[in-house]
From Swiss-Prot:
It catalyses: (S)-dihydroorotate + H2O = N-carbamoyl-L-aspartate + H(+). Gene3D superfamilies: Metal-dependent hydrolases. This is Dihydroorotase. Pathway: Pyrimidine metabolism; UMP biosynthesis via de novo pathway; (S)-dihydroorotate from bicarbonate: step 3/3. Belongs to the metallo-dependent hydrolases superfamily. DHOase family. Class II DHOase subfamily. The gene is pyrC. Keywords: Hydrolase, Metal-binding, Pyrimidine biosynthesis, Zinc.
Length: 342
């Protein structure tokens, strides 16, 4: 197959950052996506409806397309109120709230210290129909970084699913076979996003032959057996799994340092990267469901009405890309991509 036409895709998990870099990140995310769900872990975090609406306006100021719309999310803290959730839902612009366990990832220090503290908020979310997005890792120092996801599933997420059976939950950027099994076995209100880089790479790519800092992300890349489980889930056509890139840019110097930041930038070529995975798995026919159907269906939103076309046409990824007054090194920097969006 050398061409593939699919319903216009959406990205259900992306980091655009804030300030002058929006000119670059919005350009990349809006190139062919219909919608993107914008993560709220900016500095300061997006904790109120007013902040979410203001952030959306800053994003839209750089949107040069007609088809792209940013969808906003709230950052949950120990102090988030049920009233704020209702206000966010009523705004029509905020579609979800994000649970970051405190300290789990970039700019998560303001996150939730104990899930029980936000149970009234989760109850309100269940009542008004606002989705809960979850960064599924525990942050206690006694848990190995490669076991954080499994421990979170057992100790944190399972009780939430049991206590709030009607709350729609997205387990974001899953990285383990354990998460695949959890989502498959959970009720119909639990789904998951999967990134391109967790499908393409495992921890050997990051660590063998020298440390590759641009593969360092959170949740961290796992062993090959988990990677294969993710590929199987993503390409299966199962409606519980859909596209969320977790594209997370950092300036080159912040990645290539003695204490490098976590995050991989894929927004420049996300759909093309996914297409490679699906082609290698012999499941290109399921890319449309993963990229364009399952996400809006789970969110209760209409599918996009127009289409985009991928062609088998090699093109080089630049060694770096503009990032405000700095540069970002994208995934596949200096290499060729096999697919291209026309």
């Amino acid at each position: 197959m050398t061409t593939l036409t699919i319903t216009r895709p959406d990205d259900w998990h992306v980091h655009l950052r804030d300030g002058e870099v929006l000119a670059d990140t919005v350009r990349d995310i809006s190139r062919y996506n219909g919608r993107a769900l914008i993560m709220p872990n900016t500095v300061p975090p997006v904790t109120t409806t007013e902040m979410a609406l203001a952030y959306r306006d800053r994003i839209q100021a750089h949107n040069q397309t007609e088809q792209f719309s940013p969808l906003m999310s709230l950052y949950l803290t120990d102090n988030t109120t049920a009233d704020e959730v209702r206000k966010a839902k009523a705004s029509g612009a905020v579609v979800a709230a994000k649970l970051y366990p405190a300290g789990a990832t970039t700019n998560s220090d303001s996150g939730v210290t104990d899930v029980k503290k936000i149970y009234p908020v989760l109850q309100a979310m269940q009542e008004v129909g606002m989705l809960l997005l979850v960064h599924g890792e525990v942050t206690t120092h006694d848990v190995d970084i490669f076991d954080r996801e499994k421990t979170f599933l057992d100790n944190v997420l399972a009780p939430i699913v049991q206590d709030f059976p009607d709350l729609k939950i997205v387990l974001e950027h899953i990285t383990t076979s354990d998460a695949v099994v959890f989502v498959k076995n959970a009720n119909e209100n639990v789904a998951a996003t999967i990134t391109a880089h967790h499908l393409l790479y495992n921890r050997n790519h990051m660590l063998v032959g020298g440390i590759k800092p641009h593969f360092y992300c959170l949740p961290i890349l796992k062993r090959n057996t988990h990677q294969l489980a993710l590929i199987s889930a993503a390409t299966s056509g199962n409606k519980k799994f859909f596209l969320g890139t977790d594209s997370a840019p950092h300036a080159k110097g912040a990645k290539e340092s003695a204490c490098g930041c976590a995050g991989s930038y894929t927004a420049h070529a996300a759909l093309e990267l996914y297409a490679e995975v699906f082609e290698q798995a012999g499941k290109l026919e399921n890319l449309e469901a993963f990229a364009s159907h399952n996400g809006p269906d789970f969110y209760g939103l209409p599918r996009n009405q127009d289409t985009i076309t991928l062609v088998k046409d090699a093109w080089p990824v630049p060694a770096s890309m503009p990032f405000g007054g700095d540069i970002v090194v994208p995934i596949r920097a200096g290499e060729n991509m096999e697919w291209k969006v026309k």
